[in-house]
């Protein structure tokens, strides 16, 4: 990477750090709280490609691991994201690391792949619409995979904690997190990406 690209990537990593460890990473929308942690990951993917996008996704996963291991280890669902939680009822395992890292890394891959495919299939040189679609898919990749892997590795434990059936959990998660975060990514990311490409 040249110096300009390196500085841009460092700036995005700094934003990701702020979003993951401060209240600035959460936007209250009525009773819903949408997180912004996926925004830098999607921006990195669309601006710099698969490699940097997956790197930012890995950093997001690392920050999540650090948060649940050292900052909130006693939270009832901390075991879902770290094998080192202090939750009395349940303990994490290798599945916790899969949940913590794999969805975030793949969420750094899908935006640029989908954007490129959409742009080519529509025979449109304007990549803005492709970036919008890629942003939505990237955000939903994280939401769907995190929830799906939680149900694979800790389905019974998670359902016990939230005291709801699987369909209710899916619906609540998509409505409270998936849709608002996808909308935020679709609105913010393409605009920021276009600006970064022109710098």
What are these regions (language model features)?
Residues 1-199:
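Loop-helix junctions at membrane interfaces
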């Amino acid at each position: 990477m040249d110096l300009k690209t390196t500085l841009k990537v460092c700036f995005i990593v700094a934003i990701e750090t702020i979003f993951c460890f401060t209240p600035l990473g959460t936007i209250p929308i009525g009773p819903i709280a949408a997180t912004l942690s996926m925004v830098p990951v999607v921006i990195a993917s669309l601006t710099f490609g698969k490699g940097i996008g997956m790197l930012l996704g890995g950093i997001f996963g690392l920050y999540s691991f650090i948060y649940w291991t050292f900052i909130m280890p006693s939270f009832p669902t901390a075991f879902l994201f770290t094998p080192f939680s202090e939750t009395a009822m349940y303990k994490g395992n290798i599945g916790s690391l899969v949940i913590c890292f794999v969805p975030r890394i793949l969420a750094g891959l899908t935006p640029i792949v989908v954007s490129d495919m959409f742009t080519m299939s529509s025979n449109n040189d304007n990549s803005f619409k492709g970036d919008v679609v890629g942003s939505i898919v990237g955000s939903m990749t994280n939401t769907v995979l995190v929830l799906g892997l939680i149900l694979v590795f800790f389905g019974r434990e998670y359902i016990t904690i939230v005291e709801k059936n699987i369909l209710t959990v899916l619906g609540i998660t998509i409505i409270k997190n998936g849709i608002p975060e996808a909308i935020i990514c679709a609105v913010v990311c393409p605009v920021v990406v276009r600006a970064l490409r022109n710098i």
